[in-house]
A protein has these predicted regions:
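N-terminal glycine-/serine-/threonine-rich phosphate-binding loop
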Residues: 1-49
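Short acidic, glycine/serine/threonine-rich loops at helix termini
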Residues: 22-24, 59-64, 114-118, 147
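Ligand-binding beta-strand-loop-alpha-helix segment within the catalytic cores
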Residues: 68-141
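Conserved small/polar residues in nucleotide/adenosyl-binding loops
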Residues: 145-151
Length: 155
């Protein structure tokens, strides 16, 4: 077990399988527990950065699709719907603990460009100073390359 007591900043990665059931529907119990633990760490003075996958999986559930899409336009459509749903849920759950969250969607182009990357880093630093939990994800709606690869954890 990691001792978080000596850490000031904690980065947590949550994947689709952590956030959703195989049906694509939200795993409410698990997400509620995670938000409670992260809120407690935040209230103890820790800076929390949340890297969250799950947009496509949430979109599959929200759209009641029978399975995860295989074609890129359908994956992107599911991601567009799912990202809204995912952030709505995070905002709702964290607000119960009076914690504000922010969405930061990244692409390979942003991360590889030094000036754009610096803007993102500056934004994250300012959000943390304001007591906000930044929630980062790759922008699956426009990141074509990412959708054709098996992993979703590049952010």
């Amino acid at each position: 077990m990691i001792d978080f007591t000596k850490k000031k900043r904690i980065v947590i990665k949550l994947g689709t399988s952590t956030l959703t059931h195989k049906t694509g529907k939200l795993n409410i119990r698990r997400m509620t527990n995670l938000v409670q633990v992260l809120s407690d760490l935040h209230n103890a003075g820790k800076e929390i950065l949340l890297v969250s996958s799950g947009a496509i999986g949430m979109g599959v559930g929200k759209l009641n699709l029978p399975e995860r899409p295989k074609d890129t336009p359908s994956k992107q459509a599911a991601a567009a719907v799912g990202q809204c749903e995912l952030m709505h849920i995070y905002d709702d759950m964290f607000s119960k603990y009076s914690i504000t969250v922010a969405q930061i969607l990244l692409t390979k182009t942003i991360v590889q460009n030094p000036e754009r990357r610096q803007h993102v880093q500056n934004t994250i630093e300012r959000l943390l100073q304001l007591g906000v939990i930044p929630i980062l994800n790759e922008n699956d709606t426009v990141s074509y390359t990412h959708l054709t690869l098996p992993t979703t954890s590049r952010v």
